[in-house]
């Protein structure tokens, strides 16, 4: 399919069926689009909308976000996952405040230099908010292009990604780029979906190689399968009345900056930790274990619950917090921690 025909058909479809009333599309600004694009990485639109609205209510400008404590940013992000996005968002806001006087940058080089912003995200920010001519290549766009032009191979491989970038550059029109880029994301999300694509409703069906051959399931190519390693983590749920001990993780790494239960490799090291602090372990109870899966490994979590009558022994340690179950503080929590806190709130650990 010729590039001009491709873009014309996509734009025509967008004018009739595309999404135009998402919260970040109303009174568009680079800040709003940036926030939405970061949230939409690895996350569905329906999930993102309430988070976006809460962020905008609390941080209406990039300066408000820059001035906020990281704990509060992580707290508002809790549940969205991939927490490095939130840490990078906060860092980038501080960079905008420091280097650009609080005004969101409007050149590709400056936007792409922000933490957590790559080529596609920078292109999306500038094209969607300011109409600047930059192609994009998020997961939805990769899928549409790979199927239409039968680009074989996993897009995580550099040569496959380069082919897709080349196609994106060719089909992105000089006029109407903001509509076109939004249309391509909408097509991938609404029509050219991972499974059960609605080919009969697609504006590209007359020129799509995968549709013609009924071979959509081959594109884009799958990531080579690998068996995820398994690890075990013992979580200590130390509870005094309505309060539970949490410790803040280091800024980088797994659950960076979030508050979690003290974690141990095995029960023996957990008991040693208690003994060093002269905390009796007589009532230590193992709760139901469960699995939490990261992108690169499985973590089998074994919660160990211990009610205590006092908590003076732990408060001299840095970055610890007695989390009040009845009046929860505004801090970022890892998803399994949130789950266990909810369990403790019911008053019946199992």
Predicted regions and their residues:
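Intrinsically disordered, low-complexity, charged terminal extensions of DNA damage-control enzymes
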Residues: 1-20, 25-26, 189-350
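Catalytic cores of DNA base-excision repair glycosylases
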Residues: 2-4, 8-200, 204-217, 230, ...
């Amino acid at each position: 399919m010729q590039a001009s025909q491709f873009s014309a058909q996509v734009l025509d479809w967008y004018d009739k069926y595309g999404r135009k009333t998402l919260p970040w599309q109303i009174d568009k600004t680079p800040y709003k689009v940036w926030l939405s694009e970061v949230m939409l990485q690895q996350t569905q639109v329906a999930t993102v909308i309430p988070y976006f609205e809460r962020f905008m209510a609390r941080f209406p400008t990039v300066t408000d976000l820059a001035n906020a404590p990281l704990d509060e940013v992580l707290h508002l992000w809790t549940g969205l996952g991939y927490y490095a996005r939130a840490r990078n968002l906060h860092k980038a806001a501080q960079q905008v405040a420091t280097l650009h006087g609080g005004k969101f940058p409007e050149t590709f080089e400056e936007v792409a230099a922000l933490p957590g912003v790559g080529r596609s995200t920078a292109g999306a920010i500038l094209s969607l908010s300011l109409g600047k001519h930059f192609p994009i290549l998020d997961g939805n766009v990769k899928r549409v292009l790979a199927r239409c032009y039968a680009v074989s191979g996993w897009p995580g491989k550099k040569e496959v990604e380069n082919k897709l970038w080349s196609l994106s550059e060719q089909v992105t029109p000089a006029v109407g780029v903001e509509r076109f880029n939004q249309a391509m994301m909408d097509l991938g999300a609404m029509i050219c979906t991972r499974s059960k694509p609605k080919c009969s409703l697609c504006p590209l069906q007359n020129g799509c190689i995968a549709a013609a051959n009924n071979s959509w399931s081959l594109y884009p190519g799958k990531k080579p399968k690998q068996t995820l390693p398994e690890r075990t983590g013992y979580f200590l749920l130390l509870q005094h009345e309505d309060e539970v001990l949490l410790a803040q993780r280091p800024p980088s790494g797994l659950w960076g900056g979030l508050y979690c239960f003290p974690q141990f490799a095995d029960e023996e090291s957990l008991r040693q930790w208690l003994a060093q602090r002269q905390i009796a372990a007589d009532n230590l109870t193992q709760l139901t274990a469960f699995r939490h899966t990261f992108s690169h490994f499985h973590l089998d979590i074994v919660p160990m619950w211990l009610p205590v009558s006092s908590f003076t022994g732990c408060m001299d340690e840095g970055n610890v917090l007695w989390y009040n179950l009845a009046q929860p503080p505004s801090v970022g929590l890892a998803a399994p921690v949130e789950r266990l806190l909810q369990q403790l709130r019911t008053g019946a650990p199992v």
